[in-house]
Amino acid sequence: EGLLQLPSDK
């Protein structure tokens, strides 16, 4: 989406 994609550690 319009959100900035960070590498999720979960």
From Swiss-Prot:
Q: Which GO terms describe its molecular function?
A: L-ascorbate peroxidase activity; metal ion binding
Record keyword Protein transport present: no
Q: How is the cofactor bound?
A: Binds 1 heme b (iron(II)-protoporphyrin IX) group.
In the record, the note on similarity to other proteins reads: Belongs to the peroxidase family. Ascorbate peroxidase subfamily.
| A single BP term in Gene Ontology | hydrogen peroxide catabolic process
Q: What does the UniProt entry say about where the protein is found?
A: Cytoplasm
Write down the required cofactor(s).
Answer: heme b
Per the UniProt record, the source organism is Pseudotsuga menziesii
Q: E.C. number, please? A: 1.11.1.11
- This protein is called L-ascorbate peroxidase, cytosolic
**Which enzyme class, named as a word?**
oxidoreductase
Function description: Plays a key role in hydrogen peroxide removal.
Q: What else is known?
A: Binds one cation per subunit; probably K(+), but might also be Ca(2+).
Which Gene Ontology cellular-component terms appear in the entry? cytoplasm
Q: Could you read off the lineage of the organism from its UniProt record?
A: Eukaryota, Viridiplantae, Streptophyta, Embryophyta, Tracheophyta
Swiss-Prot/TrEMBL keywords: Calcium, Cytoplasm, Heme, Hydrogen peroxide, Iron, Metal-binding, Oxidoreductase, Peroxidase, Potassium
For this protein, what reaction is catalysed?
L-ascorbate + H2O2 = L-dehydroascorbate + 2 H2O
